[in-house]
Amino acid sequence: MDSQNKNSVDAMDGIESRGMKERGGRTNSFLVLRVLAFVLTSTAAIVHGVNNQTETVPIQLTSSMPPLYVPVVAKWHYLSAFVFFVVSNAIACSYAAISVMLSFCGKKSMVPIILTLDLLMVALLFSSNGAATAIGVMGYKGNSHVKWNKVCNVFGKFCNQVAASVVLSLIGSIVFVLLVMLTAFRLHNKSK
């Protein structure tokens, strides 16, 4: 009888320890994803936020005069789409840092709030990525319909940094999508 009770207690200990490992593994994966989202969005904001380039460009006033060489500066805050991009990534990075701290609290009542805020970050990042990408494509190709010339042939470094920051932010937004999917899956499994 004692051996039977001992075996059932050992089995319960095994189940409990396995459950703790699974919870810890899930918590660790959430923590890693949140830290990754923080690193990606903060790097995207910094790379884009320090982006500027000055080039000397010839301007032809009339065909009879020689060209006038003028220094022209490209900065991220000259375009509202780029301002939106930097601010959105700064917000997402701040939220990722706060959510890492909130995940240590471990309150189950916070899970729906964090899920909602994760969804908000996904929407914010994807919209800012779209805005920055649209302006980036204009810079690379121009728009012949409205006579906008391409500028990336002049400001190559600036355009390359824009492209790099958009890629980083896009990966960061995919990490937030993974967080939303994992959290929703976890909530669904707990409701069964």
Swiss-Prot record:
<dbReference type="InterPro" id="IPR044173">
    <property type="entry name" value="CASPL"/>
</dbReference>
<keyword id="KW-0472">Membrane</keyword>
<feature type="transmembrane region" description="Helical">
    <location>
        <begin position="82"/>
        <end position="102"/>
    </location>
</feature>
<feature type="topological domain" description="Cytoplasmic">
    <location>
        <begin position="103"/>
        <end position="118"/>
    </location>
</feature>
<comment type="similarity">
    <text>Belongs to the Casparian strip membrane proteins (CASP) family.</text>
</comment>
<dbReference type="GO" id="GO:0005886">
    <property type="term" value="C:plasma membrane"/>
</dbReference>
<keyword id="KW-1003">Cell membrane</keyword>
<feature type="glycosylation site" description="N-linked (GlcNAc...) asparagine">
    <location>
        <position position="52"/>
    </location>
</feature>
<dbReference type="InterPro" id="IPR006459">
    <property type="entry name" value="CASP/CASPL"/>
</dbReference>
<feature type="topological domain" description="Cytoplasmic">
    <location>
        <begin position="1"/>
        <end position="29"/>
    </location>
</feature>
<comment type="subunit">
    <text>Homodimer and heterodimers.</text>
</comment>
<keyword id="KW-0812">Transmembrane</keyword>
<feature type="topological domain" description="Extracellular">
    <location>
        <begin position="51"/>
        <end position="81"/>
    </location>
</feature>
<keyword id="KW-0325">Glycoprotein</keyword>
<feature type="region of interest" description="Disordered">
    <location>
        <begin position="1"/>
        <end position="22"/>
    </location>
</feature>
<feature type="transmembrane region" description="Helical">
    <location>
        <begin position="30"/>
        <end position="50"/>
    </location>
</feature>
<protein>
    <recommendedName>
        <fullName>CASP-like protein 1E1</fullName>
    </recommendedName>
</protein>
<feature type="transmembrane region" description="Helical">
    <location>
        <begin position="119"/>
        <end position="139"/>
    </location>
</feature>
<feature type="transmembrane region" description="Helical">
    <location>
        <begin position="162"/>
        <end position="182"/>
    </location>
</feature>
<dbReference type="Pfam" id="PF04535">
    <property type="entry name" value="CASP_dom"/>
</dbReference>
<feature type="topological domain" description="Cytoplasmic">
    <location>
        <begin position="183"/>
        <end position="192"/>
    </location>
</feature>
<feature type="topological domain" description="Extracellular">
    <location>
        <begin position="140"/>
        <end position="161"/>
    </location>
</feature>
<dbReference type="InterPro" id="IPR006702">
    <property type="entry name" value="CASP_dom"/>
</dbReference>
<keyword id="KW-1133">Transmembrane helix</keyword>
